[in-house]
């Protein structure tokens, strides 16, 4: 089964924010991505708004509602009160909770579910009551207990942190080891009734191996590698390439 592609727009927003100018237009690139076959858009609004701005959210929400009603909006972030209120106002189809410190450059680890289980259960319950699906950022280390604890929060999905796998480059032996651990984690999730997303440093080159090991992968969220390719091939063609790497047939 093909995985859905959600295009992360943070890198586009970061480029825009280098100047006090309205371009590149985040919503315009979101429109191109969805028109080219992406199933959704992802943003990670940080407290300092260093890339995605809070004002981007209603614009992207309206884009999906008005032009692409079958697409999904995914908002990532650490669940502060301000973040939760932002989600409640925006009503994304999915909220992906990550354990980031506000100063982190990017998400680089999953939740410690042993430590944060009670906290996450409360947050998940609040978001679900608001009609949002919740995914929890998780390390793909192959252990079962953390996945069991994630399932007990009431979340519908986990998102596998694929950074170490994405960073292997040409080290095939290491990549094989890491993708097997990711696969074991996904197997535990499936057995516990959790759907599985994945994200971080995924590329057209490394997606097929991941898809082969996790054929039930529901969604991948990709920003940096996709944006880098878009600088060479254009956004629309790049999205089509990533959709194909996800196992989708280009229309």
UniProtKB/Swiss-Prot annotation:
It catalyses: 3-amino-2-oxopropyl phosphate + 1-deoxy-D-xylulose 5-phosphate = pyridoxine 5'-phosphate + phosphate + 2 H2O + H(+). The keyword Cytoplasm applies. Keywords: Cytoplasm, Pyridoxine biosynthesis, Transferase. It is found in: Cytoplasm. Transmembrane segments: none annotated. Its EC number is 2.6.99.2. 3-amino-2-oxopropyl phosphate binds at residues 8, 19, 201, 223-224. The keyword Cytoplasm applies. The active site is at residues 44, 76, 200. Pathway: Cofactor biosynthesis; pyridoxine 5'-phosphate biosynthesis; pyridoxine 5'-phosphate from D-erythrose 4-phosphate: step 5/5. Homooctamer; tetramer of dimers. This is Pyridoxine 5'-phosphate synthase. It comes from Agrobacterium fabrum (strain C58 / ATCC 33970).
């Amino acid at each position: 089964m093909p995985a859905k592609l959600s295009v992360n727009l943070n890198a586009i927003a970061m480029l825009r924010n280098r100047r006090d100018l309205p371009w590149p237009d985040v919503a315009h690139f979101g429109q191109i991505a969805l028109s080219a076959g992406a199933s959704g858009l992802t943003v990670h609004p940080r407290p300092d708004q260093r890339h995605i701005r809070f004002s981007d959210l209603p614009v992207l929400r309206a884009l999906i509602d008005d032009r692409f009603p079958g697409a999904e909006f995914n908002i990532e972030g650490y669940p502060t009160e301000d973040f939760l209120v932002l989600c409640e106002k925006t009503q994304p189809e999915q909220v992906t909770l990550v354990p980031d410190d506000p100063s982190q450059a990017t998400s680089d680890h999953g939740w410690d579910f042993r430590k944060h289980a009670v906290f996450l259960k409360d947050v998940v319950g609040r978001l679900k009551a608001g009609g949002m699906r919740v995914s929890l950022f998780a390390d793909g280390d192959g252990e079962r207990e953390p996945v069991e604890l994630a399932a007990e929060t009431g979340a519908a999905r986990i998102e596998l942190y694929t950074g170490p796998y994405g960073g292997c480059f040409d080290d095939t032996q290491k990549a094989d080891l890491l993708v097997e651990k990711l696969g074991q984690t996904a197997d535990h999730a499936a057995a516990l009734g959790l759907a599985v997303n994945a994200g971080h440093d995924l590329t057209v080159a490394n997606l097929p191996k991941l898809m082969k090991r996790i054929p039930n992968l529901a969604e991948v969220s990709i920003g940096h590698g996709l944006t880098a390719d878009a600088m060479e091939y254009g956004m629309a063609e790049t999205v089509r390439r990533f959709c194909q790497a996800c196992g989708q047939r280009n229309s």
